[in-house]
Amino acid sequence: MKNRKFIEIIGLLSVVGSLIFVGLEINQNTTAVRGATQQAVSSQVAEMYRIGAENERMANLVSKAFQDISKTDISESDYVSLWMYQMMGFRRIENIYLQYKNGLLTKDAFSRIGMGIYRTKIVREIWDERRGDFEPDFVEFFEELRDN
């Protein structure tokens, strides 16, 4: 009888120890996933900066956007180029939003976006044309983020 209780206590301690180990492993894995997510977001930003740095035309278009131009102020091909570039930006913010909703990023991730370009006249025009390509929850979130 004493041996049985001793074996049960050993078994219980083994189960508790295993659960603690699993909990620690899950925590470590979550930390690794968050780190990888933050790295992916940083890579997206770096790619956008690289395009602007290496492509004089794109750098010029971004500069013009900050001069409050609208779609009618540039050629159709320039507009399409800026549209594609800004869609990268919108998708980057959408990715941050989805990772935030999934608990992989904190709300402070949005403070590092650099919302200035998204408040310009031409980028608002692009957004108005393309907002239907995004989930309604994200549209509402993005517009509140952009406008505040």
Question: Predicted segment positions?
Answer:
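Membrane-proximal alpha-helical anchors
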Residues: M1-K71
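Short, flexible coil/linker segments at or flanking structured domains
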Residues: N3-R4, I9-S14, N29, V33-A36, ...
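Extracytoplasmic/periplasmic/luminal assembly and interaction segments
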Residues: E54-E94
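An amphipathic alpha-helical interaction surface
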Residues: D78-N148
